[in-house]
């Protein structure tokens, strides 16, 4: 039996996965939705001391409370910022993770914070500027206000999200602690050895399978490991909130990812045999 651990990003909580979790459970999977400290229905625990280690421990505890005898395979799904505590937890418990899923998320790098990666790798534009200004907007130096309804509409990449789902997002969104975004993540080679799946939301997004294949073909060192046959990929023609816009399709994608399905990239690395000169 497979257990899915679903980790949401900033401003949200386990509630975000309601419809996806229902779809996974109807297919016979076990589902755990992680709410990170200071977010969602745990917003009352927010404080200036919350950092990335806090959120990594949140996810680690969810994994530790899944009985390995009953459910040996854990598929860990990190969405948006949620990939950072997910990768950190996978680094602590690699033996429990059968697959790590990057759901429309960055690819965390050892020694970088989320803010570091945005600053160095995100294309210039309003989205980058808004993310980098989060610390300046934080109330009391640590609490980042949740977007207003107008801000969700203007900047949330909500393609496919219904008015009812948007109203729910606006009602339940919580402020986010600033500390986790600025803390550098530490990742060992244990994470690199895990099977992975990347899911790209392509409507309004900046990456898809074709673009990634072009990067691999260019020889960019950062992405060459993604041509590993254990790495699979899916494109979803929706905006940044697939659990709200297309929950049934997302549940199907996650089930297929757990089964090892998905697109595989072609490696550009070739082996050349050489012998002694004649």
Regions found by a protein language model. Name each.
Residues 5-11, 35, 79:
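The conserved beta1-alpha1 loop
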Residues 11-19, 31:
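Serine-hydrolase catalytic-loop signature spanning alpha/beta hydrolases and amidase-signature enzymes
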Residues 21, 25-44:
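Conserved alpha/beta-hydrolase
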Residues 38-74, 91-92, 115-123:
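Active-site loop/oxyanion-hole signature of alpha/beta-hydrolase fold enzymes
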Residues 72-114:
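Conserved hydrolase catalytic core segment
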Residues 91, 101-142, 180, 207, ...:
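Flexible "cap/lid" loop of the alpha/beta hydrolase fold
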Residues 174-237:
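Conserved serine/cysteine hydrolase catalytic core
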Residues 228-278:
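Catalytic active-site module of serine/aspartate enzymes centered on a nucleophile-bearing elbow/loop
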């Amino acid at each position: 039996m497979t257990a899915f651990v679903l980790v949401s990003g900033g401003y949200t909580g386990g509630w975000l996965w309601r419809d996806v979790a229902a779809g996974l459970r109807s297919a016979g999977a076990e589902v755990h939705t992680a709410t990170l400290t200071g977010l969602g229905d745990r917003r009352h625990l927010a404080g200036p001391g919350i950092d990335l280690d806090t959120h990594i421990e949140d996810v680690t505890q969810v994994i530790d409370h899944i009985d390995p005898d009953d459910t040996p395979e854990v598929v860990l799904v990190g969405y948006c910022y949620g990939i950072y505590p997910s990768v950190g937890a996978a680094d602590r418990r690699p033996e429990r993770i059968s697959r790590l899923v990057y759901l429309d998320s960055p690819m965390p790098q050892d020694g970088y914070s989320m803010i570091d990666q945005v600053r160095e790798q995100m294309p210039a534009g309003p989205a980058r500027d808004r993310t980098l200004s989060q610390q300046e907007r934080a109330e009391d130096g640590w609490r980042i206000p949740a977007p207003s309804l107008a801000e969700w509409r203007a900047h949330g990449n909500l393609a496919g999200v219904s008015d009812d789902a948007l109203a729910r997002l606006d009602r339940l969104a919580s402020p986010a602690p600033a500390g986790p975004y600025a803390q550098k993540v530490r990742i060992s080679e244990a994470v690199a050895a895990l099977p992975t799946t990347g899911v790209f939301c392509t409507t309004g997004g900046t990456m898809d399978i074709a673009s990634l294949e072009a990067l691999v073909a260019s020889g960019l060192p950062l992405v060459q490991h993604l041509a590993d046959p254990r790495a699979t990929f899916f494109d979803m023609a929706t905006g940044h909130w697939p659990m709200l816009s297309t929950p049934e399709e997302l549940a199907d994608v996650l089930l297929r990812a757990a089964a090892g399905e998905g697109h595989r990239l072609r490696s550009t690395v070739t082996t050349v045999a050489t012998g002694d000169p004649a």
